[in-house]
Amino acid sequence: MPMWLGILVGVVALVAGVALGFFIARKYMMNYLQKNPPINEQMLKMMMMQMGQKPSQKKINQMMSAMNKQQTK
């Protein structure tokens, strides 16, 4: 096998592996987000109501900002 053919096969295999890995990771993340959607303000309001708290917009904003700060760490 000539040297250039070996290099070409290696590069093609590498590109194919990267592309396949990207699509597998994308599919996994889409399924994960479908099963576990991120918490939004409406969900937070419902959780507070279920816990017996009266959800004010100020409390919801404080909790959302605290959750966003925690995620960025």
UniProtKB/Swiss-Prot annotation:
UniProt keyword terms in alphabetical order: Cell membrane, Membrane, Transmembrane, Transmembrane helix
GO cellular component term of the entry, any: plasma membrane
Localization: Cell membrane
Membrane-spanning ranges: 4-24
Superkingdom, taxonomy of origin: Bacteria
Keyword check for GTP-binding: no
Membrane topology: Single-pass membrane protein
Sequence similarity: Belongs to the UPF0154 family.
HAMAP family: UPF0154
Protein name: UPF0154 protein BcerKBAB4_3367
Gene source species: Bacillus mycoides (strain KBAB4) (Bacillus weihenstephanensis)
